[in-house]
Every structure is written in C-alpha cells, then in structure tokens.
Amino acid sequence: MKFTGTKNYVSTEDLSMAVNATIALERPLIIKGEPGTGKTLLAIEVAQSLDMELIEWHVKSTTKASQGLYEYDAVTRLRDSQLGDERVKDIKNYIKKGKLWEAFDSEKQVVLLIDEIDKADIEFPNDLLQELDRMEFYCYETGETIKAKKRPLIIITSNNEKELPDAFLRRCFFHYIQFPDRGTMEGIVKVHYPKIKKNLVKDALDLFFDIRKIPGMKKKPCLLYTSDAADDLLC
C-alpha cells in the first residue's frame, strides 16, 4: 500500500516518501507549505488512492482540542429534563462525536485530516498529544474509554502562522511542500489541462514566475492563479 500521486495530484519523490513513511510507521504527518501548494488536497488524494474514507477536521481560531473528541450538550439535556423528555435517561443522546471519535470508531482504517492546525491556540496540539499517542481517550459523561478500532492515517496541515510545540513535532513526521519549480508546474498544468497548447502553457508560466519574482511582494500568486490563468486561456 504505497502512495505515488494520482491522476489529479503530482507528487514529488520526497513527498511520496513522507506519506509512505507515515503509512508504514503509523505516525502523523505534518505538511507545511505556502497557501495553495496542495496541502489539503494531498489528504483527499491519499484517501482516494488508498481507497479509504476521508474524515476532515477543519480547525478555526476558536477550535478546542476537546471538540475533536466530543461535545456534551448539558443545556439541551437540562431543558429536556424539565419537559419530561424520555431521552434524558440516556446521556449518549446529548453527546456529539468529534472527528477524532469518528475516526477511532471506524471499522476500517480512515484518513483523518486535521486542517490548518496553526489557526488554533498554541496549546491545541499539546492537548491532543495523549490521544494521538495512545489512540484512545476517556469520555467522562459515559465512563467509556474510546479506543481506535483501526489506527487512522493522520495528515495535519499548517500554513506556518505560528510554530507548533516541540513535544508535538517529535511525535510526527514532517514535510515542507516546496513551491513547484517550472518543470513540476508544467506537469501539474498538463494533468489538469491535457489539451492545452504548449505555447499557451509557456506564456502563462512565464507571466506567473515573473510575477512571483517581483521584489517585496507580500502575497505571491499560488497554484490557483495558474489554474485561473489556464481557464482564461481556454475560454
């Protein structure tokens, strides 16, 4: 079971090696790189390539690590108890499984994407250390220990907005997706636009890389810019 890229995703040798090491050694993979370099898409394509379900956990600035485990709706349970609702007899009716619980609960191995982990509070990664190490967590409301039935393949993306804790990094593989060179970029364009003329690709890439070379540019154009340019050229 190896990943070498897909018909929709051009993977470099180094990136494929990182993914395959993660598969073989069952450690999370942290993917960093410029916005638009295909970090999130990698998880989607890995899942498709390996015929696994993809579970996506998109992290926001307000996201707490505990939300990946579960959320207990005590307010609704209190209200239902006041209304005499029979559901209050089973506390599980008020527990919403998080993405980590979903991944642990799957009968088959899944790909778990923890997307843009650096958006959350600095303690967020450390709060997941034990759960990712042991592949289990305790649900206080039900008194259950939730253990992973199959260890998920975990891919974590980061835009490098803030540094991740050393203790967390030590437990993961790491790969930085370098921005594609011209040859790799040509391959990416051909994958998505197989019928586009070579001279149009050359003109689009000349313009693209010239813009990226402009000194002092804070936000350089990403791969999506090339895709938009190719769409315009084909219109």
Where are these regions (language model features)?
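AAA+ P-loop NTPase catalytic core and its hallmark functional loops
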Residues: M1-N199
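Conserved small/polar residues in nucleotide/adenosyl-binding loops
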Residues: Y225-D232
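Amphipathic alpha-helical segments of the small helical/lid subdomains adjacent to P-loop NTPase cores
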Residues: N199-L207
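A short helix-loop-helix "switch/interaction" segment in the helical subdomain of ASCE P-loop NTPases
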Residues: F209-P221
